[in-house]
Amino acid sequence: MTEPTQHRYIPNAEEDVKEMLATIGIDSIDRLFESIPNDVKLKKLLEIPGPWSEIESRRWFRELATKNRSAVDHLSFLGGGSYAHSQPACVDQLLLRAEFLTSYTPYQPEVSQGTLQSIFEYQTHQCLLTGLDVANASLYDGSTALCEAVLLAERVAKNRSKIVIAKSVHPQYTDTVRAYIQNLGYEVVEVGWGADGRIDLDALRAACTSDVFAVAIQSPNFLGVLEDYDAIRTIADGEGAVKIAVVAEATSFGIVSPPGEHGFDICVGEGQAWGVPTQFGGPYVGFMVVRDALKRHMPGRLVGETVDVDGRRAYVLTLATREQHIRRGKATSNICTNEALIALAANIYLSLMGKDGLREVAVQCLQKAAYLREKLAAISTVTTPLSGPVYNEFVVRTPYAARDILADLEHEKILGGIPLADFYPGHENEFLVAVTELHSREHLDRYASVLSACISRERR
């Protein structure tokens, strides 16, 4: 008996295809795809070359990789929510352990006490850093963490329809919130910033009406400026709105007073800065921490500590509010496989660094940013227009288009920053510069020197 003709890598033989077509009542592949317009159909065979050897394949990928611009072969001052920090070598090494190398928490979680313990430790770090009471096991990233916080706030402050978000919250986070709530009937009210780069308190006061269920601000904000938590809390409390703090640069917790100590209800953000490389924008890890009264409204997983029948310490999933565990109508989230492996990386990093190590990273970021900010402001026609206090990121303004200046810097192997106009039209001459502990004094001096030369060339 002859075997049906079949391509080596395609499981369906010609006889199989004919049988399937007959089952659905048509006689050809062309009939199957006749709904596709002819002008977009490929009418010739693809010219695919023959197979490559492993050596040839590796060579091709290496050549392709040389087109990337990275912080290895460029001096990078990119930030805007993704920061190149030092990652201790043992973080990656520990992640490679077979019992950890998965992003999935198991469906019989109590069997995996090691996994649950690592998540519990991660949650403990979050509580200590934010000054709040209860953290969950992680979320997808900073933007979706903010979305979940907004939905949580609406569940708590019922029968209200507006969320006030500072315009200086990462614009991509705000866009994600709009996508989440666009069909839920809620309105996003944005409040701008003043000359110091902080949220305009008068505008915030006017925006906080009785139908606002939450106020969300970011600190350090997208412009790099540290917000006044106390002033914002006072205004939000006047209308009983839930107060949400967003932190996209998580090393700032090493030196900045946490939002929980200033009366905020929820802190969410991006944990990438805790030992996770920038890696093309992901995967990252979102975090959420709330005051105790809100714990039953939290999305995702939560690990608790208890004792087993023999009196030994044990870890369990508790307050499970996912739709897999309770009625869909009562569920607070459908968060499923999240970023447990990346949360483990953050946990390892924070455990290794400790309080003193994290503070040292934060102090270096703060001091080096202040040094570069002063150096750049000393260049003729260059200003740092926002007067508010900053952590490790700040806005630079020149008389020339930011894209042109940054292109000139890139020719010198410097990734000089992010054009602000990509996020805020009308700011075409401004760009955002981020500094971390990886930058040396020589790096900062070189940046200032090359920028000065670029400005001089533009003048001519």
Where is each model-derived feature located?
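PLP-dependent enzyme catalytic core of the Aspartate aminotransferase-like
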Residues: 16-22, 124, 422-460
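Active-site C-terminal subdomain of aminotransferase-like
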Residues: 274-380, 384-387
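N-terminal entrance/gating region of PLP-dependent enzymes' catalytic architecture
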Residues: 34-121
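Gly-rich Lys/Arg/Thr-decorated short loops/hinges at beta-loop-alpha junctions or inter-strand turns
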Residues: 97-109, 125-132, 158, 181-189, ...
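Conserved PLP-enzyme active-site core in the AAT-like
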Residues: 144-312, 381, 396, 403-407, ...
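Charged, compositionally biased N-terminal leader segments and the immediate start
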Residues: 1-21
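Short loop-beta-helix segment that forms the pyridoxal 5′-phosphate
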Residues: 107-111, 115, 123, 127-147
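Conserved PLP cofactor-binding pocket of PLP-dependent enzymes
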Residues: 387-389, 412-431
